[in-house]
């Protein structure tokens, strides 16, 4: 058994993202690594729209999805708040208005596994959809 509960944690700061969060969530459920192997951590950063309710609904349906809430402090503050709670071997930061290609988590984690003692950071191409 691995010392990690998940292959990866996707940490998502959320602030007034009701317009985009659904597409973000959809991109995570379609990951080729298997959705059950990914932990999703939403950190609501004081949203005033329905973002928190959307994330809560998603977290109530899946045990690998959690919603944390805090007062607004900005993206970095939300990431720092969520990071200690992450249970994945690898941590991905994803903004609530972004999506991942369906093989991103698998490709990045496979790469990290192959160069585990040599590489500390990987970036990937971002494509705007709006």
What are these regions (language model features)?
Residues 1-130:
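Nucleotide-sugar donor-binding/catalytic module of glycosyltransferases
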